[in-house]
């Protein structure tokens, strides 16, 4: 399945299937395997199951929460993580291509098509395949065919505005038979700046993710401290087996779910050029 098809489908429905997730995974990596499924099922399942058990010590309720956590991990977290990794790798490959292509064009002995051939050879994954198709489409093509070939490439990567501008300049170079190197260098500089911003943004999010993991550990320690400070039997009878404990735990779990949902929304929002309404 093509990535463009995947993107169109994911905008229309909440969950995606394994084939669609795999389309992202194989674009710049290996296909989904058993370890991927186990990882995204076991970790969220254990976190929700163990945490609910520490609050109420009801095994069957913890089992239900554990199953819910596993489903959430497979249906929500796994697609988001894989899609985010795809977008990161795709952008880095585009940035590498822009830098390689500009460097090659700076050499007067290199023609545009020769530079495109060499730059595509240095690329990897999905972008490499797209560049090979573009190169094959423009070689010996008339003006209309060149326009159509670049239009298809541009439509696929239109979310990367700077890269789209770079493609427009390459299209002009092919049609006019001359290279506007200074303009290409300016676009390359801007794309490099975007990469630096994205990398810095990702580092900040990784730091917040570490803080989130630490917070979860602190919460577990806090719950255990309360449990053993009152005595295990007292905690069970006065809280875990009491309606007050059920209501309090229900409210607490609900608040934690909302907090986690807000955090994951922030974590997987990598757009730094758009302002949300």
UniProtKB/Swiss-Prot annotation:
One of its GO terms (cellular component) is plasma membrane. It is a multi-pass membrane protein. Keywords: Cell membrane, Membrane, Plasmid, Transmembrane, Transmembrane helix. The keyword 4Fe-4S does not apply. This is Uncharacterized protein pXO2-23/BXB0022/GBAA_pXO2_0022. The chain crosses the membrane at residues 37-59, 63-82, 214-236, 246-268. It is found in: Cell membrane. It comes from the Bacteria. It comes from Bacillus anthracis. The keyword Transmembrane applies. Its main location: membrane.
């Amino acid at each position: 399945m093509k990535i463009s098809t995947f993107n169109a489908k994911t905008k229309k429905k909440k969950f995606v299937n394994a084939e669609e997730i795999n389309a992202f995974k194989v674009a710049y990596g290996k296909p989904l395997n058993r370890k991927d499924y186990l990882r995204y099922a076991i970790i969220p399942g254990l976190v929700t199951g163990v945490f609910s058990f520490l609050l109420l010590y009801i095994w069957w309720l913890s089992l239900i929460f554990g199953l819910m956590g596993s489903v959430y991990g497979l249906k929500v977290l796994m697609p988001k993580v894989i899609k985010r990794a795809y977008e990161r790798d795709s952008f880095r490959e585009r940035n590498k291509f822009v830098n390689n292509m500009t460097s090659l064009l700076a050499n007067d002995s290199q023609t545009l098509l020769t530079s495109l051939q060499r730059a595509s050879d240095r690329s990897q994954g999905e972008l490499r395949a797209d560049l090979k198709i573009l190169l094959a489409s423009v070689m010996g093509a008339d003006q209309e065919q060149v326009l159509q070939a670049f239009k298809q490439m541009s439509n696929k990567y239109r979310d990367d505005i700077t890269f789209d501008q770079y493609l427009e300049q390459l299209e002009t170079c092919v049609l006019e038979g001359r290279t506007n190197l200074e303009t290409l260098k300016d676009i390359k500089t801007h794309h490099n700046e975007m990469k630096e911003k994205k990398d810095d943004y990702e580092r900040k999010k990784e730091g917040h993710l570490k803080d989130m993991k630490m917070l979860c550990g602190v919460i577990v320690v806090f719950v255990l401290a309360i449990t053993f400070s009152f005595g295990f039997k007292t905690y069970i009878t006065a809280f875990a087996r009491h309606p007050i404990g059920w209501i309090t735990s229900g409210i607490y779990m609900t608040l934690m779910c909302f907090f986690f949902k807000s955090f994951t929304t922030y974590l997987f929002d990598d757009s730094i050029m758009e302002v949300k309404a």
